Amino acid sequence: MRKIDFKKIGLAAMMLLSALTFQSCDNDNDTDWDRVFPNALVTVKKSGDACYLQLDDNTTLLAKNLKPTIFDGKEVRALVNYSQTSEKSEKYNQVIHVNWIDSILTKKPVPSLGSDTENSKKYGDDMVDIVRDWVTVAEDGYLTLRFRALWGGQKVHYINLVTGVNPENPYEVELRHNANGDPQNYWRDALVAFNLNGVVPDTEGKTVKLTIRWRSSQGYKEVDFDYCSRKPISSPKMLEGYSQEGRDIR
């Protein structure tokens, strides 16, 4: 994901991201607003003793002030606010200083059980909306989504991406939401990243259409993402369902 100018982020997104990362932020005249909001969506990776961030398919950022043990040394998607430094690296495109970083719920897709009825029983069929936003994107072998649903704050919700729903098109998937009986009291946004690497067929360098379907508050919808498999790398092990925040969603 290219670096983002936070001034161009919509107010709703800014409020969401502020709530995720700065739950108790002093509101004074000394606030450095350039550091309050995220300026990039990245994949957190490690290589030996180094922690680096994958900004897009071709750009890597060496985070010198992060240890490779961050997030238990697992690969996750994350929102980050960083500053460039004057240092150079032969291995990475840029050397950066991370001002703050916050992981996104990161998980693998789940397989279809063969029918809509069985998928609904297992993965749920509650309403969910995908929000058009700068963090809703397919890149680095991940599908990252900002989504919106009704919450009651009493039960854990489950969000899953179901693969294998169309035997004729392996790049067709479904987003499933299980509210787990939680009362529908208010709308709330959340973020999730699905690791498609090794789950859907390798596109072998080509860009294909990844179609996602879901049951929205206005009926069934679908949208296409441009998807290209990650370039071959030695990737750390994925941590299923890891998230620092959002303990009421899995």
For the regions a protein language model found, what residue spans apply to each?
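First exposed extracellular module after export/assembly in secreted or surface-exposed proteins
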Residues: 2, 35-250
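Bacterial N-terminal signal peptides that target proteins for export
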Residues: 2-11
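Hydrophobic helical h-region of N-terminal Sec-dependent signal peptides
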Residues: 11-19
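Bacterial signal peptide processing site
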Residues: 26-29
